[in-house]
Amino acid sequence: MKNIKVTLSSSQILALNTTPIELVPAITGKLLIPQFLFQKYNHISTAYTTGGLFRIGLGSITFGFSAFGAVITSADNAQGLNNFVYSQSTSGFTYQNLPLIIGATSTNPTGGDGTLDLYLTYLEVTL
């Protein structure tokens, strides 16, 4: 298992539906499988409003793992722990050589100004 920390800025959070963020770059010959995500929201003055959930995906949030609620709507510092459930089988889709990305599932969050620390634990499987 591997761990990585990624901090999302306010501008990245506000564009998370239109511009998903790469958490782990693609690795040739490897399949990346997320296991756990710890979210740490660093509130500044205004909470975000979201129109949907967040999702981690392989190359795209449309091919993703379980969607989850983001802690960025809290009026103070907040934390959340998410584990992932997945059962994907897609004909003609290649799982390896794809990055792990995070995005908002329906609309961009609005209104907030804090940052979000993401601590991702994932498997790196050689195929």
Where are the model-predicted features located?
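Short structured motifs
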Residues: 19-23, 85-87, 104
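Terminal beta-strand-rich extracellular "head" domains
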Residues: 49-90
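C-terminal interaction-tip segments
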Residues: 1-13, 105-127
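Sequence-level motif detector for i,i+2 pairs with an aromatic at +2
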Residues: 1-3, 29, 97
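Generic detection of short hydrophobic beta-strand segments and adjacent strand-loop junctions
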Residues: 4-8, 12, 21-24, 79-82
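Beta-rich globular "head" domains
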Residues: 14-64, 116-125
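Noncatalytic modules at the cell exterior or secretory-pathway interfaces
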Residues: 37, 90-112, 117
